[in-house]
Amino acid sequence: MSKTEENKYEFGLMLPERYQNGIYLFNQSVPTVDEGLNGTVPEKIRRFNNAASHLVRSILTVEQVYIEGIPILQLCQDVDSVYDNTYRQLIRNVYMELFVYQEKLLNIVCNIFFLEIKKSKQKNLVGLRKRSASFPLLCEFCEQCNQLVQDDKYKRVMSIRDDETHNMSQIDSFVLDLEKTEEGLRIVNKGYRIKAETLRAEYVYAMEKLLQIRNLVQEMLTMYDLRDIYTKLKEQGEEIWVN
């Protein structure tokens, strides 16, 4: 895959210049050195980008295998070929990493707006929306997240991911039928329930949606100074929480 193609997958966040000199804390007063260093903006973004790199690596790997394997898929008649099986395993990794990336995006926005991170995504979004009165970009972020969770195509991707974690794989599921033979009935494998091309189209769709949200998070980091966020939240009477 060329460098130009790799640049399509800019899932990481850039550190704004204002945070590059000295230690700039998410927290305004930290009780220990360790918590202070882990609370710096560069460290938060480094950890986010590290998580994003897992997704990028998964995508680049599966795309390379896809390009190399198109002729194999066209020639192979085996419904459970080694190539197809391997490709599906790699796609599964992408689906898993998309979910992790979605969580990381929401978490870093909670960091930026000093909101305690809950286990429920919906509770986090409700908390962020409460804080969005003075921050139009945060309001837009909440709207995009709500649209995403209601998007049928995106929900399908997350449904497939959920089934993978609960040992009910849709990716590895076959269409089976019964066929009469002279010896009696036998089970016939008619191929995978979901075609590899469909799985690929769905994760590409989800990836593009998440990139739109990532771009908005980058804009928030660039446009909003954490000191201003802190001051406005205090004025609104919001509780300040450092994750």
Could you tell me what each predicted segment is?
Residues 46-75:
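Extended, loop-rich substrate-binding clefts of extracytoplasmic carbohydrate-active enzymes
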Residues 66-69, 73, 105, 112, ...:
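Leucine-rich amphipathic alpha-helices with coiled-coil/heptad-repeat character
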Residues 1-57, 85-89, 107, 117-243:
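Acidic, Ser/Thr/Gly/Pro-rich intrinsically disordered interaction regions
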Residues 61-64, 74, 78-118:
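Amphipathic alpha-helical interface elements
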